């Protein structure tokens, strides 16, 4: 199939340039003004911005095992609606992808249902228990984007050391959910701060995150493993990672849109404000933005975590942990970081597309020769975030009702038109 994206605006060295992008059999074959390219599908992109497709290294697509929350089909459609062309799917599934046979179940679903590039993680431990026997990383590494027990922390230094050694030997990466449950009281639901104390809700202290990060940095220094910290939420975590990078430790990290734009001051006693890790203090939020700007935080990942309406209808105490975010990430960050002057647009694109692509060795992009990974956005849109418009099964977002000034109009992933809200010229 031959596709032409006509008259879009591409940001190059701080300047917008009107550009055509020609795609043949899923590969970018030409870029330039007024291309002569006979195409079966021509999309008029005049007035819209063209970006490399976004990459999210931390999503929960819930299949196999929990299709009432999300499916590969609905989740990948939601990703395309958000401008994403590649996502890495976390392994808290049933069965957990801890063996070749179990991984094949997920791979079959992806092959049959995904409209974008979905790459599975395998679990670090058998059954994704955070302890005990490790998965066969050497056997699985060629089929996965990395190894994670996301949703659980790896409980002991001995287990993590062995995992890092095996992961390094397999030339893969560990994406670590850093949470030490010994710090968290029964029923811990939100940050251990003013809101928790005022409402009598058990709080989750910052130590539960930064203590295991501190442990793992020492192990990473020892083993040389490629190591990535998931959903960083505390100022102490940022400081530890900044220092480790200065020492040359092979470490990267991510944070999420909700941690950059919200803090515990914004909490309401609603399930859509409950996620793990929780929204922290204002000074944590400020430290995360500073870390994103100075490169300590390498990338933005949504931790898109859909649940059923019933599971999110029990307030902060009783609701399941997790919010959706894949369809709202760029509109929110563009509106509240770029338009407010807190971050250059080029940096936001790097943190959402280029940096995760580099670290996780993901192909695709918008240059000639790349596997096509392109998203088209209207940066003059005036919309309000309405969960009823989501393609995800999940509806729980803390940003419901927020005004945003960007909207995805088209997403192209390889030879697939993964999302289309543009009129097409035949």
Language model: regions and residue ranges:
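Histidine-rich, glycine-flanked metal-binding segment
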Residues: 1-53
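Divalent metal-coordination and catalytic microenvironments
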Residues: 8, 26, 47, 58, ...
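C-terminal cap of metal-dependent C-N hydrolases
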Residues: 8, 315-318, 368-426
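Metal-associated gating/positioning segment near the N- to mid-region
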Residues: 46-113
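Active-site mouth loops of central-metabolism enzymes
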Residues: 57-70, 119-131, 151, 202-206
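Alpha-helix-loop-beta-strand connector modules within alpha/beta enzyme cores
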Residues: 100-117, 166-176, 328
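Histidine/acidic residue-rich metal-binding segments in metalloenzymes
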Residues: 132-300
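His/Asp/Glu-enriched, well-ordered alpha-helical/loop segment
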Residues: 198-226, 293-294, 298-300, 305-379
């Amino acid at each position: 199939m031959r596709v032409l994206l006509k008259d879009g605006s591409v940001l190059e060295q701080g300047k917008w340039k009107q550009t055509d992008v020609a795609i043949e059999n899923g590969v970018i074959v030409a870029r330039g003004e007024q291309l002569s390219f006979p195409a079966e599908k021509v999309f008029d992109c005049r007035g819209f911005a063209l970006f490399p497709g976004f990459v999210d290294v931390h999503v929960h697509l819930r299949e196999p095992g929990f299709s009432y929350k999300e499916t590969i089909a609905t989740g990948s459609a939601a990703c395309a609606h958000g401008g994403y062309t590649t996502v890495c799917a976390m392994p808290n599934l049933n069965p957990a992808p801890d063996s070749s046979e179990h991984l094949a179940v997920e791979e079959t679903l992806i092959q049959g249902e995904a409209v974008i590039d979905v790459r599975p993680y395998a679990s670090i431990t058998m059954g994704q228990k955070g302890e005990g026997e490790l998965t066969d990383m050497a056997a699985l590494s060629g089929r996965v984007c990395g190894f994670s027990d996301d949703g659980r922390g790896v409980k002991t230094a001995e287990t993590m050391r062995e995992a890092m050694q095996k992961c390094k030997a397999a030339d893969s990466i560990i994406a670590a959910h850093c949470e030490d449950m010994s710090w968290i009281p029964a029923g811990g639901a939100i940050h251990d701060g003013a809101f928790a104390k005022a409402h009598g809700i058990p709080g989750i202290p910052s130590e539960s995150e930064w203590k295991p990060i501190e442990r793992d940095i020492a192990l990473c220094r020892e083993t040389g493993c490629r190591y990535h910290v998931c959903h960083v939420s505390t100022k102490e975590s940022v400081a530890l990672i900044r220092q480790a990078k200065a020492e040359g430790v092979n470490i990267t990290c991510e944070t999420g849109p909700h941690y950059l734009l919200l803090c515990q001051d914004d909490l309401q006693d609603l399930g859509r404000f409950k996620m793990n890790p929780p929204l922290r203090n204002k000074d944590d939020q400020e430290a995360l933005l500073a870390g994103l700007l100075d490169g300590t935080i390498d990338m933005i990942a949504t931790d898109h975590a859909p649940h059923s309406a019933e599971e999110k209808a029990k307030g902060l105490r009783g609701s399941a942990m997790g919010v959706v975010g894949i369809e709202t990430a760029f509109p929110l960050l563009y509106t509240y970081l770029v338009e407010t002057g807190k971050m250059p647009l080029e940096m936001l694109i790097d943190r959402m597309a280029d940096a995760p692509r580099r670290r996780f060795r993901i192909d695709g992009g918008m240059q000639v020769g790349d596997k096509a990974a392109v998203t088209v956005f209207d940066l003059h849109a005036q919309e309000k975030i309405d969960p009823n418009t989501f393609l995800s099964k999940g509806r729980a977002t803390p940003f419901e009702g927020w005004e945003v000034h960007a909207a995805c109009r088209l997403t192209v992933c390889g030879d697939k038109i993964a999302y289309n809200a543009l009129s097409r010229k035949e």
